[in-house]
UniProtKB/Swiss-Prot annotation:
Recorded GO CC terms: nucleus
Statement on biotechnological application from the UniProt entry: Griseofulvin is a spirocyclic fungal natural product used in treatment of fungal dermatophytes.
Record keyword GTP-binding present: no
Compositionally biased residues, Polar residues: 72-88
Functional description taken from the UniProt entry: Transcription factor that regulates expression of the gene cluster that mediates the biosynthesis of Griseofulvin, an important antifungal drug that has been in use for a long time for treating dermatophyte infections.
Alphabetical UniProt keywords: DNA-binding, Metal-binding, Nucleus, Transcription, Transcription regulation, Zinc
DNA-binding interval(s): 9-36
Organism phylogeny: Eukaryota, Fungi, Dikarya, Ascomycota, Pezizomycotina
Organism expressing this protein natively: Penicillium aethiopicum
Disulfide bonds: none
Originating gene: gsfR2
The name this protein goes by in its record: Transcription factor gsfR2
A family per Pfam: Zn_clus
Parts forming coiled coils: none
UniProt cross-references to CDD domains, sorted A to Z: GAL4 (cd00067)
GO molecular function: DNA binding; DNA-binding transcription factor activity, RNA polymerase II-specific; zinc ion binding
Amino acid sequence: MPPLYRRSCITCVQSKRKCDQGLPKCQRCLAKNIHCEYNPRYPNRRRQTTERNVDENVSLVEPIAEEPSRGCQLQRSPARPTSPTHSPHANDIFFNFANDPFNLESIPQDNFLNSTIFEDVVTQQAPNDTERITSDTTAQARVEFAAKKLSVIPKIFSQQGQTMFIHRQLFQDRAPPALQDALSACALYCLKSTENQTLVFRNLEHKRKQLISSIDPLLASKLDLLEALQALVLYQIISLFDGDIRLRAQAEADEPVLLMWAAQLTLRTPQFQPPLGLSNPQSLAGSASMDWGRWLIEESSRRTLITASMLKGVYSFVKLGYDTVPDMRMSFTAQAVLWNSQSEISWRRAYKEKERLEIQVTHWDETIAKAKANDLEELGVLIMVMLKGTGATGEWLGHSQNIRYGLEEAYYGSV
């Protein structure tokens, strides 16, 4: 009679390493992106495809992507080996950003990533796929806007230490290795040139592999898992949309890791409940008795899950012309003053005085009816574009906000 416990996978046995006996792959095999097979005497232990497991257990929300470099192709190629040496973390002083308000408008909307990304990816597809992408101009305009905005996130993070899903005050004092490495990798990537491109890509590859091999999503604390997922999202944005074939192939191979980590974080993250016709914002779940530190963790988690979902959705749409139906049961706090607060005092004041706009995406219209144009920040605008289109969003925001978020071009003549 076979034993009731699961045996270690063959790879871990051969390497004499401890196996966590996970399905469809153990954590070690998943991190190394290799086949994971249990003893064939027990058929029910045999490897299943990672893609099937992820699709059955995880679904995320929607689009993201942007403008990168040229010469991309979509065939997978083996990952370039990286140096076995452990790169030192950046000095803690690297995290000493001033407590200035998060000022997204100060980031120039230049061609940080080359604008040929869409044409480059689309032209690699079969004719039927290309037709599917270009036939729905409404979806195409929304995805392109989200892609162009979200792809500059690594640059924003390197310059300000904060993005629409990473809050500076949550990690600045802790200086976690995952985000510390991501910050240095993003900063180095912003300095990429023809001469140093190989070094920049090797550094990025090393940081990514180091991150994936160091995190067990089942054992990591919620904060460690959050920071690891945030770092991985940054690496994926760069790799998917830079235009380098090797980076893109590796990012596609790492997508199951992203989805697995997101699934684990989802299980630990409370979401807001739908309004149920209640007009008092205090009645929304999670509103009462909240301290700033806890709020930063929970809100960062919700925003990170939405951003990871956008990354998956936009890239799938750009590459394939469609995306699977996303799980819209996500929520976040859309109030810009709350997310951009850099001190507990300013956050508490805004928490009491401002409309908090705790939005469940599936109930967008009920909550957004209470908002003004200047209440929204980048994530809220992106979600609104994905739900309502660039034209409707631009009309709701008004001229000054259109300029602020780069919607003026999309608004005139777009959908």
